[in-house]
């Protein structure tokens, strides 16, 4: 980045952007990859850059499984601690500026090692923005879990999901992209997550 990156202490951050599962195993190659997901990359980059320039938190979350992962009883083998678990190169250039990278063994980033402990330290936090994939799985699960987590702790934190910066996969006749995106939008909104077309709608 040519612009200056502002870094704040975790306790001072008022906003945090989480980049979810924009890794090789979901976006480029592997049993669960859908390369069309990368079409949201141009919409994600400005969100990351703005976060870095204004001192918001920036966190990367990627899948990272082992042969013993119970999740693999329901999904084909993917992101087994290899190249598939790495952030795609278009976004990896920003990962070096991330405050932290988390690796998860489930479809909900809240349970990634260290996540809850970190969130409880973020006493100034007012907004969380989620970008990445998949809208109806890891984005939805994290968004709803965060909503409940913050409510339980009486933390008044807005959770924002920009529709142009999240995506899911498409398998004709099995998993329709549009239908599953729309269903996830509704489920998230019904639990108190703010859905916006783009981050331009967010003051």
Model-assigned labels for residue ranges:
Residues 22, 64, 165:
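Active-site metal-binding loops of divalent metal-dependent hydrolases
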Residues 65-67, 135:
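Solvent-exposed loop/turn segments at secondary-structure junctions
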Residues 16-22:
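N-terminal nucleotide-binding beta1-loop-alpha1 segment
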